[in-house]
Amino acid sequence: RSVVILEGNRFLNQPDMRASERVREMYFSSAALVRDGGVCILIQESGHPIVTALTSWNPSMATHQDLQERLELSLPPYVRVATVSMESGEIVRLKGSLQKAIDESRLPSHTRLLGPVTIGEKSTLILTVPVADGQSLIATLHEFMRRRSAAKKALPSLRIDPYSLSH
């Protein structure tokens, strides 16, 4: 039995930081179906690390490349991430409050506030901190949620270390 994987670049051009993970799993799972005498044909840009990893049957090679890129870009698993989604006007106030907490050292100085990104009437703020400072960020966000709940205000959507950062 042989396997043909078409349009490899399309799989990797998804706006999701986990795309390469899924592609690596799909490629190696598909290639594992090849039987004696069969071939695996991959239609993919030849310079991509996944091609070298698949050719040498070494998935750790592609994983290592992925992790190196994430380290350089300060992405998970090297940082903790939280996303907060709520009404657009409120997210601006929340971002201001979080920036003030950073300035006053109530949140780690390495906390990054990304966004907000607005879709419709809701906006999402992405927060990242080094793994070592993750508990401080999470405690602050849980306190924010507790206070909103006590004040009977609408609770935002809070995701800690979400699987995906895209909507």
Where are the regions a protein language model picked out?
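Accessory helical-bundle/CTD segments and flexible terminal tails appended to RecA-like ATPase motors
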Residues: 1-18, 32-167
